[in-house]
Design a protein with these regions (language model features):
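Conserved beta-loop-beta connector loops within the AMP-binding
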Residues: 366-386, 425-426, 488-492, 527
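Conserved pre-ATP/AMP-binding loop-to-beta segment of ANL
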Residues: 152-173, 180, 216-226
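Conserved AMP-binding/adenylation subdomain of ANL enzymes
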Residues: 193-230, 234-276, 291, 295
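AMP-binding/adenylate-forming catalytic core of the ANL superfamily
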Residues: 88, 94-95, 105-107, 316, ...
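Gly/Ser/Thr-rich phosphate-binding loop
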Residues: 146-147, 247-250, 274-279, 289-354, ...
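Conserved AMP-binding/adenylate-forming core of the ANL superfamily
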Residues: 2, 21-64, 71-72, 89-94
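Conserved AMP-binding A3 loop
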Residues: 31-33, 169-207
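Structural core segment of the AMP-binding/adenylate-forming
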Residues: 48-49, 79-151
Length: 550
């Protein structure tokens, strides 16, 4: 039987609808036929350079069609691509390339200045391929991506001597804000199974019976998904959304210049008649709503029926605001991580709404206490969210972290990245936050996310970040960094009282620091190490043995 790999599915789709658009960006259109030819050329180049079965390919670029083609070429040749965070400095990039055992590096030419000082210490890299961009030329030590992609081999599609297998890997580097980055190892066959083999319950689409059926379905589907992607492809949310659209015979819509800007997002959605959109929670949804509020009626969004989010909190008030402007839209809020897809999901539309951080527990999911007991619905206990079934193999070259994140309970293996939650009597899961960020103040556990969400409900607060700093008496005390809406100056006492009106009094921040920006990463996530450093620099020395935790 044909293996469940991205390459096998995408080749089937490309053969069925070669002239349709696979990827668009600005005015640029890449057809399925063009994507197929370029990926074959990349696959042939990787093999000629000496890469072997499951050799690793690093893709170090902003959002662009070449990003997807670089991965596709790797999938064709039975190789294992992985992502590189383009915000990293030289030593961070060197660590990641070394830890990932990169043998090929595909990169934006604008990052040549980062790679040049470290490439001499990367003897395992057999080929460097640069994507030329505006104002950036290909360095003399790298090959031009366009030149490589133009060398389309006569024998196609390209398949390596070792073939393709369900066990072929996709590596997703994650976790750089709380320690060194780690690569999550997903087998492609498990990813396909986790995604229901192309099934879509919302549309009543059944699962595929084989990879070859993907092309038949794409040919027979009159209105294919057109998916506008806001977050970086270098993170799992954007990457998997793009891969899903291509596998369904749809079009991936990337924003011009490769970076998120709310007006450009809505421009692209309207221009290409997007049917779906992918964001990362409130950090993307808030500026998107602000753009709609500032420009009522500017964009025709009548084709947009679904917006999906994963990776960050997305509050109820924002969802209702988006629905006011796009009344037909379904807002699908998924609680997932690179290690654990599908921990929970909520759906908000004009007919009904979900509370912030409230989800229906996903299939094959559970909550376990620290001693391995299953948390029963309505018990009031909290524990770590766990996903069973199709889960990653673990972290690449990190058996200790693999053992702690993928434990065995009740005789089966689970993925437990560290998200704490409770489950109510009706089965609704309430997310508390990531355990690694938990603040212990006077013996009480406080999760930053719940305080952040409470602060963001204040009309003067655009965004917020919460951390703990050492306290001689109570262990830690809570500090909030608050990013206000333009033209307002939040009052610290008012904000503290605002939190006390929603949460236990000990969860109210002891100090509120008004900042220009909480400095979220491009994927919408907070760098809690940097936030703690900012709080310590401002208030750490002042927090001695005074004041209580409540």
């Amino acid at each position: 039987m044909t293996a469940w790999t991205y390459a096998n599915i995408w080749e089937s789709v490309a053969a069925a609808i070669p002239d349709e658009a696979a990827i668009v960006q600005g005015d640029r259109v890449v057809s399925f036929a063009a994507m197929e030819a370029q990926a074959d050329a990349l696959a042939a180049h990787y093999l000629k350079a000496g890469l072997g079965q499951q050799s690793k390919i690093a893709v170090y670029a902003t959002n662009c069609p070449e990003f997807i083609v670089a991965y596709y070429g790797g999938f064709k040749a039975g190789l294992a691509p992985f992502n590189v965070n383009y915000r990293y400095g030289p030593e961070e990039v060197r660590y990641l390339l070394d830890n990932g055992d990169a043998e090929a590096v595909v990169f934006d030419a604008e990052f040549a200045s980062i790679l040049d000082p470290i490439r001499g210490r990367m003897p395992g890299v057999k080929t460097w391929i640069a994507i030329a961009g505006a104002g950036h030329i290909v360095p003399d030590w790298a090959e031009d991506f366009d030149a490589v992609a133009a060398r389309v081999p006569a024998k196609r599609p390209v398949v390596a001597p070792w073939g393709r297998h369900n066990e072929d890997l996709l590596l997703i580097f994650t976790g750089g804000t709380t320690g060194m980055p780690k690569a999550v190892m997903w087998q492609q066959g498990d990813l396909m199974a986790k995604g229901g083999y192309g099934a879509n319950p919302l549309l009543g689409t059944p699962p595929l019976g084989s990879p070859e059926e993907a092309g038949e379905r794409a040919r027979a589907t009159p209105i294919k998904p057109r998916s506008v992607i806001a977050p970086p492809l270098m993170h799992a949310t954007g990457l998997i959304a793009a891969f899903t659209a291509i596998g369904a015979g749809g079009t991936v819509i990337l924003l011009p210049h490769g970076k998120f800007e709310p007006d450009l997002f809505w421009d692209a959605a309207a221009k290409w008649r997007a049917t779906r959109a992918t964001i990362v929670g409130q950090p993307f949804a808030q500026p998107l709503l602000e753009a709609l509020e500032a420009n009522p009626g500017k964009w025709d969004l009548s084709s947009l029926f679904m917006m999906g989010s994963s990776g960050a909190m997305w509050n109820r008030e924002n969802k209702l605001g988006l629905i006011r402007h796009i009344p037909q839209i379904q807002l699908m809020d998924s609680y997932s991580s690179s290690e654990a897809f599908g921990m929970g999901i909520s759906n908000t539309n004009a007919q009904g709404e979900s509370a912030t951080a409230a989800f229906a527990l996903g299939p094959d999911c559970a909550i376990f206490t620290e001693d391995g007991r299953r948390v029963e619905a309505g018990s009031g206990e909290s524990g770590r969210l766990a996903v069973g079934g199709f889960i990653p193999l673990g972290y690449y070259k990190d058996p200790a972290k693999t053992a702690s994140t993928f434990p065995t309970y009740e005789g089966k293996r689970w993925s437990m990245p560290g998200d704490w939650a409770t489950v109510e009597a009706d089965g609704t899961v309430r997310i508390l936050g990531r355990g690694s960020q938990c603040i212990n103040t006077g013996g009480e556990k406080v999760f930053p996310e719940e305080v952040e969400e409470a602060l963001k409900r204040h009309p003067h607060v655009r965004d917020a970040a919460v951390t703990g700093v050492p306290d001689a008496r109570f262990g830690e005390r809570i500090v909030a960094l608050v990013e206000p809406h333009p033209g307002v100056a939040p009052d610290e006492a008012e904000l503290r009282d605002h939190v006390k009106g929603q949460l236990a009094t000990y969860k109210s921040p002891r100090h509120v620091m008004v900042v220009e920006s909480v400095a979220r990463a491009p994927n919408g996530k907070l760098d809690y190490k940097a936030i703690k450093d900012r709080a310590l620099a401002a208030f750490g020395a002042a927090f001695g043995e005074t004041e209580g935790a409540a």
